[in-house]
Amino acid sequence: MGAQLSTLGHVVLSPVWFLYSLIMKLFQRSTPAITLENPDIKYPLRLIDKEVISHDTRRFRFALPSPEHILGLPVGQHIYLSARIDGNLVIRPYTPVSSDDDKGFVDLVIKVYFKDTHPKFPAGGKMSQYLESMKIGDTIEFRGPNGLLVYQGKGKFAIRPDKKSDPVIKTVKSVGMIAGGTGITPMLQVIRAIMKDPDDHTVCHLLFANQTEKDILLRPELEELRNEHSARFKLWYTVDKAPEAWDYSQGFVNEEMIRDHLPPPEEEPLVLMCGPPPMIQYACLPNLDRVGHPKERCFAF
């Protein structure tokens, strides 16, 4: 009798086990492999393409471990690049312009600070010049994810006050963004995540500051997003030196620009900032305060 029950159990369970195994295999196939499995480990990635965007801006493409790998970077987070340059370890944070929708590669758009071009920084940028000198096939170490903010979708942001604290959830209907120069990359990451989801009705207002019109990083990508999602993405520029027939603002970020081109405080938006520290400290925060945006709803990358 026991043998008969055992046989019967085998007959009954075999199809169930087969179905379970099939589902697990399908699930495993549908879950891509993650490159950044451990934020404390450095992963060497190989340069496979370098595109000249402008006289001082490059798009660097690095291969992930396999064509099926994703980077594994939550929206709002960044990575660190590390390299030994002139005998010293140099580490710099960057936000990719690619996303986890892209398999097999990660893209970084980086402004190269060449030596002897800025009187205050005659040596130029150590990491950006190192990247510029890299040849196809060379590797550099990536580490991450890092950062205090994660965008979880549909207006929900998880923000940690510091690395040791639990995240505080802020849910908003609109997001104000102030970016300066290369500080556009984390903004673009969040904007793309919002715009690609038709069920995410969060409205983004971006005020983007640069020295000149030619310095506007990722302008084609930004304007394409604005044209495709005009109801949800508002874009405004300001430059220090404006050309003739310039349709946007001129000068440093000020109270009037914030009042006119960011969502009003009454909407209780989250305001994100990324740019040179003096811009954040002397232009963004004081003027946001004057307009009425409370500090607890302002976040600097």
UniProtKB/Swiss-Prot annotation:
Q: How does it sit in the membrane?
A: Lipid-anchor
Q: Which cofactor does it need?
A: FAD
Report whether Transmembrane shows up as a keyword of the record. Answer: no
Q: Where is the lipid attached (N-myristoyl glycine)?
A: G2
Question: Sorted alphabetically, which InterPro entries does this protein's record hold?
Answer: CBR-like, Cbr1-like_FAD-bd_dom, FAD-bd_FR_type, Flavoprot_Pyr_Nucl_cyt_Rdtase, FNR_nucleotide-bd, OxRdtase_FAD/NAD-bd, Riboflavin_synthase-like_b-brl
| The protein's Enzyme Commission number | 1.6.2.2
Q: What is the effect of changing K42E?
A: Decrease of activity
Show the GO cellular component annotation of the record.
endoplasmic reticulum membrane; mitochondrial outer membrane; mitochondrion
List residues modified as Phosphotyrosine.
Y43
The protein's matches in Pfam families, at most eight in alphabetical order, are given as: FAD_binding_6 (PF00970), NAD_binding_1 (PF00175)
Q: Name one GO molecular function term.
A: cytochrome-b5 reductase activity, acting on NAD(P)H
User: Where is this chain primarily localised?
Assistant: endoplasmic reticulum
Where in this protein does the record say N6-acetyllysine is found?
A: K42, K50, K120
What does the UniProt entry say about where the protein is found? Answer: Endoplasmic reticulum membrane; Mitochondrion outer membrane
- Reported impact of K126E: Decrease of activity
Query: GO biological process: any one?
Result: cholesterol biosynthetic process
Domain (FAD-binding FR-type) spans 40-152
Explain the purpose of this protein.
Catalyzes the reduction of two molecules of cytochrome b5 using NADH as the electron donor.
Q: Could you identify this protein by its name?
A: NADH-cytochrome b5 reductase 3
Instruction: State which gene encodes it.
Output: CYB5R3
